[in-house]
Amino acid sequence: MDGIVGIISRISYRILCDKVDSEEVTKRVLANAKRRSVVYDGGGKSKDWFIRHTCLLCRMAIIRRRALWLMNIRKDVFVRASPKVEDRDDYITKQAWEVYCRAVDGMTPMQVIAYVLCVLEHLPEARVEKILMITESRLDNLLKKATASIRAELAVYGKAGLYRNFVSFIIKEY
């Protein structure tokens, strides 16, 4: 079960860009799995269930965060992403994560989820289509828009040409 906990927490952290929200999503996924008697068997359908459920709860967390911000209930909450990197000492790592989180802030929840699963988690597109229950053309469209958003954020710093290096760095560090 430890293997799936790592996968859930990594995916949720990359989608939400927030450690606290990621931990909450991880706890809720595991509680729901226990309640529904879903057992992680190392892969296959159970792994897809955990990933699908993680993505659903992340979407709900983003929507809740956006609603709290829009209704002026909590102005300290970012609309989608809050780049909290206090635990990192390296300036380059902090800056890269902040660039990623700002790019995520400009994406729709589905764009972020598709990008994380396909690009950062290296899941095959056919499997992501099944998990998210979307068509191939919809997934391609989501990925193009997400990639364009990250490239645009990198262009602000004059680093648009370093997209592949940036993605490799994010995968390695987070």
What residues fall within each predicted segment?
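A short, charge-rich alpha-helical start-of-domain segment used by transcription regulators
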Residues: 1-10, 20-23, 34, 46
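Sigma70-family region 2
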Residues: 27-45, 65
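Arg/Lys-rich amphipathic alpha helix in sigma70-family domain 2
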Residues: 41, 52-74
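Internal acidic/polar
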Residues: 68-93, 170-171
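Short helix-coil-helix linker/hinge
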Residues: 94, 104-112
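A short pre-motif secondary-structure segment
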Residues: 114-118
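DNA-recognition helix of helix-turn-helix
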Residues: 126-163
